[in-house]
Design a protein with these regions (language model features):
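Sequence-structural signature of mature extracellular/luminal beta-sheet repeat domains
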Residues: 1-217
Length: 217
């Protein structure tokens, strides 16, 4: 599945690249998208959640579709109050089906039920650009935009990198520092993933590379 920013749509592909479904087109009403950032699919029923919009976008919400692409509801609205969103940049589901939203411009993760109820707000993972949750509820958060107290970065006083913790209680227990932590150009990993061996991958947009961090025994 692809979230196409300029086309303002979500496209579902087969493993062979065949287009199977296209969700919506440009707009800001309840069923249309504007600059979608991320997509997550519930493996239990195939429901699709789309985060929008990117910088300057007007929607700032999560749009929920069923597996056939039919609109169900929206979650959130523009703002900084609990339950509101500013540039929701990433999505993930934990083992209980809770929806984690990387609310990047608000420097927090917000956790919702799939019915749209706000369950929790976490700020201890920095400025979240990317989220990944393993089957055992280990949470990986890519922070590409933070920086030291020198003024580098959008969220100052903490370092950019990948924070690792618990999706159950929010405890942070590990940190992978960015390779160039003092660069002031949003150059950290924006996407994050983990393979079956526990190795961590960071997608670094500005430097156009993929980092691989090997799990030590």
């Amino acid at each position: 599945r692809s979230n196409e920013v300029l086309g303002n749509q979500v496209i579902k592909f087969s493993p062979d690249g065949e287009i199977l479904m296209t969700l919506t087109h440009a707009g800001s009403d309840s069923e249309r998208l504007h600059w979608p950032n991320d997509v997550v699919v519930d493996p239990s029923d195939g429901d699709v959640f789309v985060a929008e919009s990117h910088r300057g976008g007007r929607n700032n919400r999560i749009v929920h579709f069923d597996r056939q692409g039919r609109f169900i509801k929206t979650i959130g609205s523009a703002g900084s109050a609990p339950g509101q969103l500013r540039e929701p940049h990433s999505l993930a589901l934990d083992s209980r089906g809770r929806l984690f939203v990387g609310d990047r411009e608000n420097n927090r993760i917000q956790i919702f039920s799939q019915s749209g109820e706000l369950l929790d707000v976490w700020t201890q993972f920095g400025r979240p650009s990317g989220l990944f949750i393993t089957q055992d509820d280990r949470l990986y958060v890519a922070d590409s935009e933070s920086g030291p107290d020198t003024g580098a970065g959008e969220l100052t006083g903490i370092m950019k990198g990948i924070r690792i913790g618990s999706a159950i209680d929010g405890t942070v227990h590990s940190f992978i520092e960015d390779l160039e932590p003092l660069r002031d150009d949003h150059s950290g990993a924006e996407g994050v993933g983990v393979d079956s061996a526990g190795n961590v991958y960071g997608a670094v947009v500005r430097r156009r590379m993929l980092e691989r961090h090997v799990l030590r025994p």
